[in-house]
């Protein structure tokens, strides 16, 4: 029986408009706007490339087998190591797990904590990043590790659908050309309880399906983009001031304890892998210009680098120890150009073979 408040006789009248033509017009406007946006972003320097997402990292992490050659680190091995040259020189295709803007320790730990893994790790050490006690650098790596462990079917399917689109469409640049990225470009001043962090570098590299990063030519050559990337490094590599609500002495003590723990944990993980027959070689990749001066001042070589090697007993390759590695110039102070990365890797391979005792093994 109908309710007294219901009206079963109601009929919505659809206005007599040319709806099919309107739908076609809206579709054409959307297509035109999409094409215009794509043309515009390409005109300001963007190009189609994969986003280095947590899902892409998780996909790559799953390629690690018990005997794999794995690259772990920050953005420098991401840019500076050529996978083809490493495969040619070391005999196996490496798995690229480096991440830009991250502390590599959580990834280092994740790989070694896999009890089935007994392979080789090439690990980059940038002390200001490796010994970060917490914050975004550590959180970036932890999110990637967590995604690999908890990725849902929906996230996996979304990633598979996104890859062919990102390879062809320039404006699908996450964190820069999406709404969130564009909003981040609005300048805000620091406030007493809300400090604005340093700006991240703009688009200056391409990423392929194996997560091989290559500096784009516009950044490799002197110009506005190169200067913009350069000018961003010093603020990013300057530790933030202690929180105003924490006494400076207590803050320094807490950070000091975290750094000491990181030294201890690094050595323990190297030993853990060594007992399973695995190997680790630490590498200090080229850095030049004002950024090198800045890093040398804050973390002298005689400090963190030497101690990591001493505590862990692992071999290390420092670019400054070898003229053929030290002669490279980083266009934007922190990474090698795409052509230089190939030559650098070619020159690095003999040192890796020596550090990993591959020459001795081959001779026997």
Regions found by a protein language model. Give the residues of each.
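Active-site segments of SGNH/GDSL-like serine hydrolases
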Residues: 269-297
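Membrane-embedded segments
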Residues: 72, 76-160
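Secreted/periplasmic serine-hydrolase-like ester/acetyl group-modifying domain
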Residues: 140-276, 363
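Hydrophobic membrane-insertion alpha-helices, especially the h-region
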Residues: 20-40
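Short hydrophobic beta-strand that contains or immediately precedes a catalytic carboxylate
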Residues: 69-73, 336
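C-terminal regions of proteins
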Residues: 296-364
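Alpha-helical transmembrane signal-anchor/signal-peptide segments
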Residues: 42-62
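N-terminal Lys/Arg-rich, disordered targeting/topogenic segments
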Residues: 1-19
């Amino acid at each position: 029986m109908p309710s007294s408040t219901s009206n079963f006789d109601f009929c919505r009248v659809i206005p007599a408009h040319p709806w099919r033509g309107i739908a076609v017009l809206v579709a054409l406007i959307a297509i035109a706007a999409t094409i215009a946006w794509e043309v515009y972003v390409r005109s300001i320097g963007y190009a189609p490339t994969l986003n280095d997402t947590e899902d892409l990292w998780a996909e790559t992490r799953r390629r690690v087998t018990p005997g794999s050659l794995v690259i772990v680190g920050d953005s420098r091995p991401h840019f500076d190591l050529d996978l083809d040259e490493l495969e040619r020189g070391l005999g196996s295709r490496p798995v690229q797990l480096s991440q830009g803007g991250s502390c590599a320790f959580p990834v280092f730990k994740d790989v070694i904590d896999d009890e089935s893994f007994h392979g080789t790790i090439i690990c980059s050490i940038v002390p200001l990043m490796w010994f970060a006690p917490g914050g975004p650098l550590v959180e970036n790596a932890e999110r990637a590790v967590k995604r690999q462990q908890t990725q849902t079917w929906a996230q996996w399917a979304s990633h598979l659908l996104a890859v062919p689109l990102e390879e062809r469409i320039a404006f699908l640049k996450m964190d820069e050309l999406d709404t969130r990225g564009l909003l981040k470009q609005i300048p805000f001043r620091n406030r007493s309880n809300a400090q604005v962090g340093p700006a991240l570098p703009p688009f200056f590299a391409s990423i392929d399906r194996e997560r091989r990063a290559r500096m784009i030519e516009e950044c490799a050559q002197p110009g506005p983009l190169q200067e913009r990337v350069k000018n961003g490094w010093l603020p990013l590599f300057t530790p933030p001031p202690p929180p105003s609500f924490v006494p400076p002495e207590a803050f320094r003590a807490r950070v000091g304890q975290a750094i000491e723990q990181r030294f201890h944990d690094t050595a323990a993980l190297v030993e853990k892998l060594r007992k399973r027959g695995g190997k680790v070689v630490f590498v200090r990749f080229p850095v030049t210009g004002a950024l090198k001066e800045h890093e040398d001042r804050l973390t002298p070589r005689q400090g963190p680098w030497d101690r990591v090697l001493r505590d862990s007993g692992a071999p290390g390759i420092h670019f400054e120890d070898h003229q053929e590695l030290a002669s490279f110039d980083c266009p934007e102070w922190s990474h090698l150009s795409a052509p230089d990365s190939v030559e650098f890797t070619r020159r690095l391979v003999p040192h890796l073979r020596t550090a990993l005792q591959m020459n001795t093994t081959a001779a026997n």
